[in-house]
Structures are given as C-alpha cells and as structure tokens.
Regions:
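Predominantly flavin-linked oxidoreductase catalytic cores and closely associated redox partners
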Residues: 7-170
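A glycine-rich dinucleotide-binding beta-alpha-beta segment and adjacent secondary-structure elements
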Residues: 171-186
Length: 186
C-alpha cells in the first residue's frame, strides 16, 4: 500500500491517512463531488472540546470509496444510486496473510505464485498467493470465501495446510514469521 500511495501521490493524488470520511458531498445534480471528514476534538460526552476542529470538505474530480467490507459510506452510495439493483449479492471472504523472513538460499526475488482451490474441498472456494519480496522476505496469504458448506472448516487451518504443500513448504524451512494479519474482504 505504501508503494501504491507513493505512485498515486506522484501523479497528484492527495491521500489523507488518519482522517475518516464521515459523509458524502453531492453537487446540485446529485453527483458525488467529495467527502466531509469527521470532526476532531470531540469529548467523551459528544460535545466539542477546547481542541475541536470541524470536519473538512475534501472535493475532487474523482472520489474513490475504499472503506473495506460493508463501509458506511459505500452502503449510502449503493442505496442512492441503486448499484445493487441488477447484480448478485456481494460475496465475502476472509484473507489471512503472513510476512516471513526466509533463508537466503530459498529466496527467489520476484517470484509470484497464485493458486486456486487446494487444500479446500468441494463446497468451498478460495486461493492463495506467495510473493518473494526484497530482503529475503516472503508475503504469503490465503483467502476463503465465507459461503463454504462445511461448518467445521477452519480458514486458518486450511492456510497452514497450504504451506505444507510439497511445492511450497521448502521456502519456509529455517524461516521465521515476522508478522501476520487477517481481514474480511469483498
């Protein structure tokens, strides 16, 4: 994300990390023209404190809503413009990722691997990735759609099984997981 942010900023895109959009700005014709950020410096009682700053209007030729799963503003946009009128319901999944520092002899800078299916069984869908980054680091992850049929399926355990595949496991030999995370995605 940092790399992509740098590329966007080099093209003139303004990015405001730490400022949540609280509402949508529309012009007189109902066209989205930006967002209003949330107020800052609001006390626990909901009243403005001595450090209060009202939300800012951020206007742009283009406004991208990248809130993640079930974002509040995205829901408003979908409803207002009936974006779900002639479409299938959204699909949801869980994505699990890890960052590894691996043995230099197992590192192949630039290697990209994407898979689909295994080790998931019938009635489940998903896939994985593995990216060999700089500094002997590997990003590895696994995504499982949340509409799986087996109530006992554990996405985390399936991810661990994936890393034991004969074509994958040797990359992690003598390696160390240095960070991990999970996120709902749609």
């Amino acid at each position: 994300c940092r790399w992509l942010a740098t590329q966007a900023e080099n093209l003139g895109v303004e990015i405001y990390p730490g400022f949540a959009a609280a509402d949508i700005l529309y012009d007189d014709n109902g066209v989205v023209k930006g967002v209003i950020t949330g107020d800052m410096g609001v006390g626990k009682d909901g009243e403005p404190s001595d450090r209060f700053m009202p939300g800012m209007e951020l206007r742009g030729k283009y406004t991208f809503f990248a809130e993640g799963v079930r974002g509040s503003l995205s829901k408003k946009i979908i409803k207002k413009f009936e974006l779900d009128k002639e479409s299938c319901p959204q699909k949801y999944a869980i994505g699990i990722k890890e960052l590894w520092e691996i043995d230099p002899k197992n590192h192949k800078p630039g290697l990209v691997l994407h898979t689909q299916g295994w080790p998931l069984s019938k009635g489940s869908a998903g896939g994985s990735w593995m990216y060999h980054l700089d500094n002997n680091q590997v990003s590895v992850g696994f995504v499982v759609n949340l509409d799986y049929e087996n109530p006992y399926l554990s996405p985390y355990e399936e991810f661990q099984r994936f890393k034991l595949h004969p074509s994958i496991k040797d990359y992690f030999k003598n390696g160390k997981r240095i960070s991990y995370g999970a996120r709902a995605i749609n």
